[in-house]
Curated annotation (Swiss-Prot):
Quaternary assembly: Monomer.
Protein name: Adenylate kinase
Binding site for ATP: 10-15, 123, 132-133, 203
Chain sites annotated for binding AMP: 31, 36, 57-59, 85-88, 92, 156, 167
Entry-linked SUPFAM superfamilies: P-loop containing nucleoside triphosphate hydrolases
Organism field: Azoarcus sp. (strain BH72)
Region spans: NMP: 30-59
Keywords, sorted A to Z: ATP-binding, Cytoplasm, Kinase, Nucleotide biosynthesis, Nucleotide-binding, Transferase
Signal peptide stretch: none
Cellular component, GO, one term: cytoplasm
Amino acid sequence: MRLILLGPPGAGKGTQANFIKEKFGIPQISTGDMLRAAVKAGTPLGIEAKKVMDAGGLVSDEIIIGLVKDRLQQDDCKAGYMFDGFPRTIPQADAMKDAGVPIDFVLEIDVPDSEIVERMSGRRAHLASGRTYHVKYNPPKVEGKDDVTGEDLVQRDDDKEETVKKRLDVYHAQTKPLVEYYSSWAASGDAKAPKVRKISGLGAVDEITARAFDALK
């Protein structure tokens, strides 16, 4: 099972990724983790990436694809792998295709923007303990106060409505076109093209998991 997981921020990709990983016995490959590991290990690509990052630059797609290819050589990838948060852009998808990285499925978890905004902007946190609440789905006993200490809850900057909307704009501009990219490739009849599946990310977690497993048959 070689898979790319797509979906907007707040769609529940992380939760579903854990279930998919467990079911198929495959590692979740995050480019952020890969970069940190390569830098720490001091691999040639890691050294190159560190130079760019230390200078405040963005690591090139070429370096990222090199890291991906190295990572896929590791033993835990023999039964497959799952990409989460990569590729993010069409040039990255092209680079992966050119590098011959095999993909069986592209699974999109679809959630309307209005639902994402409600999910994320409703989050509240008690910073000292890390306890989290949601104004609609998991409200504190007293509005705006932590259940245990009675201290104030805060809305993290990441969860503010305008921030969430900006992140969604970036997703729609850069990452959502990947669905069309992979669908067109699949429609071309190329045997190497992945199967593209879309499921709804609305409902209970176990319902979404059942949809995901069903789509990956």
